[in-house]
Swiss-Prot record:
Protein name: Probable GTP-binding protein EngB
Record CDD domains: YihA_EngB (cd01876)
Binding residue positions for Mg(2+): 52, 74
A GO BP entry: division septum assembly
Species name: Rhodopseudomonas palustris (strain BisB18)
Binding-site positions, GTP: 45-52, 72-76, 92-95, 159-162, 193-195
EngB-type G domain residues: 37-214
InterPro entries: G_ENGB_dom, GTP-bd, GTP-bd_ribosome_bio_YsxC, P-loop_NTPase
Length: 216
C-alpha cells in the first residue's frame, strides 16, 4: 500500500466518521436482530476493555455509545448506523470474561455472540479489542478460537495505549503478535489505539474504508 493510498483512505475515513452516526437497534437475542443491510463491523472484547469509548472516539461523539464502569453492563448487540449513503454499521458486542455475572447470563451472552458471528453474512470484520495494560488473556484466546471457526475476518486492536509506558506497550505488542501467530485467520496488522488521545483512530477508520472498498 502506497503512502498516497494510505493518505486517501485516512481522509475518506475522516469524512465517513465525521458524518451523522446514530443508534438504531439493540438486540438481546438472535431473534431480535435488525434486518441485514449493507456492511457491518463488530467490536468484541473483555468487559471494560473500552469498546464503547472506542466507538465514541471513532465517531467524534462523546455519548453515542454508552460507557459504563460496571463490568458486563452491555448485555445486548448494539447497532449504530452511519450516514445514509454509507450503508455501513458498527456493532457493539456484549463484553465477555466477566466472571461475577450469573452463569445463566454468561451462557446467554455466549450463545448470542456465537450465533451472531456464524449467521450474519453482512458482517465484514470483527475487531477484537485487547487492553494494552493486560495483553491477551485465556478468555481472549477462546474468543479467537471461535472466530477462527466462524469464517469471519477479524483483527486485533490494542486499547488504552496511553495508560502504559512506551516500553510496556512495545512488549505488549510483541506478546500479542506472538499470540496471534497461533491464529492464522487473524488479520496480520495489529492496530494500537487510545480513545482518550485519539491515537490510532485515523488508521482504524482507514482500515474500515479499505474493507468497504474490498467488499464493494
Amino acid at each position: 500500500m502506497t503512502q498516497d493510498n494510505d493518505a486517501k483512505f485516512i481522509e475518506q475515513g475522516r469524512k465517513l466518521f465525521a458524518g451523522d452516526w446514530q443508534f438504531i437497534w439493540a438486540s438481546p437475542s438472535i431473534e431480535t436482530l435488525p434486518p441485514m443491510a449493507g456492511l457491518e463491523v463488530a467490536f468484541a472484547g473483555r468487559s471494560n476493555v473500552g469498546k464503547s469509548s472506542l466507538i465514541n472516539a471513532l465517531t467524534g461523539r462523546n455519548a453515542l455509545a454508552r460507557t459504563s464502569h460496571t463490568p458486563g453492563r452491555t448485555q445486548e448487540l448494539i447497532f449504530f448506523e452511519g450516514p445514509e449513503n454509507a450503508n455501513f454499521r458498527l456493532v457493539d458486542m456484549p463484553g465477555y470474561g466477566y466472571a461475577s455475572a450469573p452463569k445463566a447470563k454468561i451462557a446467554s451472552w455466549t450463545s448470542l455472540i456465537h450465533n451472531f458471528l456464524q449467521g450474519r453474512s453482512t458482517l465484514a470484520r470483527v475487531y477484537v479489542l485487547i487492553d494494552a495494560r493486560h495483553g491477551l488473556k485465556e478468555v481472549d484466546q477462546d474468543v479467537l478460537n471461535t472466530l477462527d471457526k466462524s469464517a469471519v475476518s477479524y483483527q486485533v486492536v490494542l486499547t488504552k495505549a496511553d495508560q502504559v509506558k512506551p516500553a510496556e506497550l512495545a512488549q505488549c505488542r510483541i506478546d500479542v503478535e506472538a499470540g496471534l501467530r497461533k491464529h492464522p485467520a487473524a488479520y496480520p496488522e495489529l492496530l494500537v489505539t487510545s480513545s482518550r488521545t485519539g491515537a490510532g483512530m485515523p488508521e482504524l477508520r482507514a482500515a474500515m474504508i479499505k474493507l468497504i472498498a474490498e467488499r464493494s
